[in-house]
Amino acid sequence: MEVKGTAIITIPLFIKERFGEGGLNRWRDALTPEAREVYPAWVLVSSWYPLKEFLTEPLRKMCDLFYAGDLKGAWESGRFSADYSLKGIYKIFVKLGSPEFMLRRAGTILPVYYTPSEMKVVECRKGQGIMQITKFPDMDQVLEIRIAGWMERAIEISGGKQPNIKITKSLTAGDPLSEFLATWK
């Protein structure tokens, strides 16, 4: 499974913003030699990278180093990634719509970042949406949590207030899919 450079480029940016240059260096030093060669200077946003080596493991290292193993770091990293993409390269996408508009397109967004992957929107109405990831061969809890954090911030950016994202089913827990229940005001 692979991840697009646009998804991984935000990790070192997030770490540097939150934990400074020293934190970024500590994190980079903890990575595998292959990942150290790419992070942070050589990430190409249009390239595809092996998911485990360049997203899953680096996120876990970040959570271990700066959050005492708490996956809250993955959530915060997902929020940062949404800011980066939805206020930057995909700004027009958000400006045109509402949280409902954005969530209706969730199925087309996920495969832009992860391949192979599939997401479908089961329900989308004012104040609530249910999205299901039905295909994601190398799902990891740290990735589900990062995706949930991304969704939360995307809802805020598109005008939703007090968003709440719950992972109600999880591929990592043996469920046939990962399900995200999003609510907002």
Regions found by a protein language model. Give the residues of each.
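Short, internal active-site loops enriched in acidic
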Residues: 32-33, 137, 170-173
